[in-house]
Structure formats: structure tokens, C-alpha cells
Regions:
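Basic, helix-initiating cap at the start of DNA-binding domains
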Residues: 1-24, 28-40, 54
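Short coil/turn segments at alpha/beta junctions that flank glycine-rich nucleotide-binding fingerprints
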Residues: 23-27, 77, 98, 141, ...
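Short hydrophobic/aromatic patch on the recognition helix
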Residues: 39-49
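Alpha-helical DNA-contacting segments of helix-turn-helix folds
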Residues: 49, 56-63
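Hydrophobic alpha-helical connector segments
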Residues: 58, 72-98, 150, 154-157, ...
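Amphipathic alpha-helical packing segments from all-alpha helical-bundle domains
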Residues: 68, 115-143, 151-155, 159, ...
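Amphipathic C-terminal alpha-helical segment
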Residues: 93-97, 133, 137, 155-175, ...
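Amphipathic alpha-helical segments used for helix-helix packing
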Residues: 95-115
Length: 197
């Protein structure tokens, strides 16, 4: 039960912070405003985070909350590739609608220069567990190639998604991330289809 409360408190802080970052900008958001918006205390904030900068690496937590919500809506009779495209579309729409390009760029920057954990690569994240489940089922159903390991497919798929987000940041959000991914992702994922299926 303590773990659930910990996740709830930390999650409230993260959700409030990213909402404020989006609404008023990262630089114009204070720790006091985050604490007030989250309905938590300053002590709780500093229990989980060294400061506001530490929240930059928490975006993966927000992504995983979205994946937790989405995994309940996945259709088991859809192909593995269709499920990946669905998850991608929903996450990229969330990014477009609630995370500024500047904040996403800061996340990538913080992950590149950190000496600590690189949360985006954490294999214990909901994201990686969900990918593994979808891809294993896809291989078992004969939808996906068997000459590639699940780990290889996960690594290249995650790299592809990060690359799409990174390019979107480089282009300063000049195009729809979700629409572009909707067009290119099926072509890129076709390489994983079992040609005999």
C-alpha cells in the first residue's frame, strides 16, 4: 500500500509540474506552484526531487502513465503492428497537445548529459514491458519475423520513436508529430512482418 501512495504522491507532483510547464513555461514555473497545483507539500516534493530540474527526467513517468491507460484499450485481435501504431498515435497526440517542443527537447538534452539514470532506456518501464508483450504475442501468432529477437525489435522500435520525437524537436514542432508518424511508421514496421504469414 505504501508503494501505491508513493506512486500517487510522486505522480501528482509530476502531473502538476508538466501541466504547469506546458501552461506557463518551464522557466516561469516555481516549485511552490507545483506543490500547490499537486495538492502535496514542499517536503514531499523534495523527498522525490532535488529541485525543479530533476523533473525534466520524469517525462518518461508521464508517458508510462499514458501507456498504463492505453493498455486497457488495446484490442487483442489487432495485429502486433496495428497495436504499436495505435499506442504511438495516442502518445504522440498527447505529446502534441500537452508537452511543449522546448520541454521535450530539454528531456532529450537531460538524458544525454546525465550521469545518473537514463529513464527513457529503463527496461522496467511500462513502455518496454508493453512492447515486449505485444511483440511476443505477434511472434507467437506468426505475424512477426522470428529471425530477429524480441530485444532487437524493441531496441530498434524504441530508437525509431525517439528519433521521430527528436526530429520533431529539431524542426521546432513545424509539423504534426502524430500525422507524420502515422504516415511513416507503417512503412518502417513492415520490415518486421513475417513474409510467410
Amino acid at each position: 500500500m505504501a508503494k501505491k501512495n508513493t506512486r500517487n504522491t510522486k505522480g501528482k507532483i509530476i502531473s502538476a509540474a508538466w501541466k504547469l510547464f506546458y501552461d506557463q513555461g518551464y522557466d516561469d514555473t516555481t516549485v511552490d506552484e507545483i506543490v500547490e497545483e499537486s495538492g502535496t507539500s514542499k517536503g514531499s516534493f523534495y523527498h522525490y526531487f532535488d529541485g525543479k530540474d530533476a523533473l525534466l527526467s520524469s517525462l518518461s513517468f508521464l508517458f508510462d502513465e499514458k501507456y498504463e491507460e492505453l493498455k486497457e484499450t488495446l484490442q487483442g485481435d489487432d495485429s502486433a503492428i496495428d497495436q504499436l501504431i495505435y499506442l504511438n498515435q495516442e502518445l504522440f497526440l498527447m505529446i502534441e497537445n500537452s508537452i511543449s517542443v522546448d520541454l521535450l527537447a530539454r528531456l532529450f538534452s537531460s538524458q544525454l548529459i546525465t550521469r545518473g539514470d537514463r529513464h527513457l532506456l529503463d527496461q522496467d518501464r511500462t513502455y518496454y514491458k508493453l512492447l515486449r508483450k505485444i511483440l511476443q504475442e505477434g511472434q507467437q501468432k506468426g505475424e512477426l519475423r522470428r529471425d530477429l529477437s524480441i530485444n532487437e525489435i524493441i531496441k530498434t522500435y524504441a530508437m525509431l520513436e525517439r528519433g521521430l520525437m527528436y526530429d520533431w524537436c529539431l524542426c521546432n514542432g513545424d509539423y504534426s508529430l502524430a500525422q507524420y508518424a502515422k504516415r511513416v511508421l507503417p512503412m518502417m514496421l513492415a520490415v518486421y512482418k513475417d513474409c510467410d504469414a
